[in-house]
Amino acid sequence: MGDPKTPRRIWKKPKRPLNYDLLMDELKTIGTFGLKTKRELWKAHTELSRVRHQARSLLALGKDMREREEPILMKSLSKIGLVDKNSTLDDVLNLQVSDLLSRRLQTFVHKILYFKTPYQARQAVVHGHVM
């Protein structure tokens, strides 16, 4: 059962952390979105895999059960802006990590307020200049 005081880890490390292609892809994503550590990227990967797993399990269900459960998932994803209201489960399965990371406040600040780098946008958010 575990100790209720200690929180559960919300990220998973990659299976092969020293894969060159994976390292280069991670560094490119970290630089593009101004992430502080790779742990933030792993959190996004884990959250996206959780959502995609829910969509795959809905596809495996029967038609009546699927019609009842699918709007709940789609409503929650459209509420946070990952998919449109009239999208399907295939759109959920086609989501990328960049879609999830582009919903962060520092990414919006970087695009809208025209900071030179995403790291400057991150600093503005952390220091409370942008709320």
Predicted features, each with a name:
Residues M1-L113, Y119, M131:
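Ferredoxin-like alpha/beta domains used as RNA- or RNAP-binding modules
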Residues F115, A124, G128:
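Extended polybasic, low-complexity segments that bind anionic RNA or targeting/receptor surfaces
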